[in-house]
C-alpha cells in the first residue's frame, strides 16, 4: 500500500438496534488498520473514546441471535457523551464509520462531521439519508430504471394490499437495516401484528410484495462493481438477523454461480443504484433473482457489514483485495471525497 500512515478514528457501537453488529465490524476494522501500520483510535459513539481495557472488553463481545432490546438501548442512550469534543481526536485524518443503523447511517452523524469539516468514510449526509429511507430509495431505483417490488406504506386498506401486493408480503420498518423488525406475512390475519412489530423500530412501516427467488448481492468500491455473491438460504424465506450474524446459518458464495449475462446485469444495476443515490466510496446492493431471470432490487446499504467474513469484504476478496487493503482504500476514498467537497464549497 506504500502511502503515508494515517491517524484513523474508528466509530462503532452506538445505540441503534444494530449495535452488536457495529461492534463486530469495528473490532475487525481496528485490527486490520493497525496491522497495516496505521494509528487507530477506538470510539464507541455511545460513550466516547475507549481506553485500552474498555476497548479489549467491548471488542471481544459477540453478535447475539437477536438485536439488543429497547430497555438496554435506552440505558446506553442515557449515558451518551459528546463525540467530537474529545481532545484525543485532534489530528485525526479520517473517521471510519463502522456503524450500522440509526443516526450513524441515516445521515445525522455524516451531517455533524460535515459541519465540523472532518473527513469520514462512505457517503455524504444527503445520500445516506436517501438510502436509509426505503420508500425514498425505491422511488429512486425506479427513476433510474431499476426494478423493485411493489410497495405501500402503512396504513393501507385491505383492498389496496390485496390488489397491489397480495400475499405473501414483507412488512418492515422503513428506516432499519439487518432485517430488524421484518416479517413475512402470509395472510390478512398476520398483517396487523407484523405492522405493530415493525412499528417498534421506526415511525414508518413499509409493506412490500414478496419476491421468491435467489438472493444475490453486489458490492461497489470506488465506482467499480465487485464480483457478484449469492446467499444460499437453505430453505429460509429471507436472510434475517439471526442468519446474517450466526456462523454457519447460511452459505455465501463469491463469485456466485450465475450465468455471465445475469452476473453482468446485477453489476450494472448495482452501479446504477450507487450513482442514482449519489453514493460515495463503497456500497452494497441486494437483489432477488426470480425464476424468470429478472433482478429485483431489495435495498442498498451505504455502510455494509465490515467483518472479514461480511458480504462486502468477501466480494472484495473475490476481486483480489485483502481485508486490510479494503479498509485502507475506504479510508483514502473518504479523505478524497471530503477534500473535494471542501474545495467545491470554497
Swiss-Prot record:
Record: residues binding Mg(2+) 1: 286, 299
Q: What is its main location?
A: cytoplasm
Binding-site residues for Mg(2+) 2, renumbered to this chain: 299, 301
Q: What cofactor is this protein dependent on?
A: Mg(2+); Mn(2+)
Coiled coil location: none
**Cofactor binding, per record:** Binds 2 magnesium or manganese ions per subunit.
GO CC annotations?
cytosol
The pathway that the record names for this protein is:
Cell wall biogenesis; peptidoglycan biosynthesis
Q: Name one GO biological process term.
A: peptidoglycan biosynthetic process
Q: What does the entry list as the binding residues for ATP?
A: 164-217
Question: InterPro entries attached here?
Answer: ATP-grasp (IPR011761), ATP_grasp_subdomain_1 (IPR013815), D-Ala_lig_Van_CS (IPR000291), D_ala_D_ala (IPR005905), Dala_Dala_lig_C (IPR011095), Dala_Dala_lig_N (IPR011127), PreATP-grasp_dom_sf (IPR016185)
EC nos:
6.3.2.4
Q: Which UniProt keywords apply?
A: ATP-binding, Cell shape, Cell wall biogenesis/degradation, Cytoplasm, Ligase, Magnesium, Manganese, Metal-binding, Nucleotide-binding, Peptidoglycan synthesis
According to the UniProt entry, its GO molecular function terms are: ATP binding; D-alanine-D-alanine ligase activity; metal ion binding
Catalytic activity from the UniProt record: 2 D-alanine + ATP = D-alanyl-D-alanine + ADP + phosphate + H(+)
Quote the Pfam families the UniProt record gives.
Dala_Dala_lig_C, Dala_Dala_lig_N
Gene3D superfamilies in the record: 3.40.50.20, ATP-grasp fold, A domain, ATP-grasp fold, B domain
Places the protein is found: Cytoplasm
Where is each ATP-grasp domain found? 138-332
Query: Where are its TM segments located?
Result: none
Give the family this protein belongs to, as stated in its UniProt record: Belongs to the D-alanine--D-alanine ligase family.
**Function, please?**
Cell wall formation.
Q: Spell out the NCBIfam families in the cross-references.
A: D_ala_D_alaTIGR, PRK01372.1
Protein name (database record): D-alanine--D-alanine ligase A
Classification from the root reads: Bacteria, Pseudomonadati, Pseudomonadota, Gammaproteobacteria, Pseudomonadales
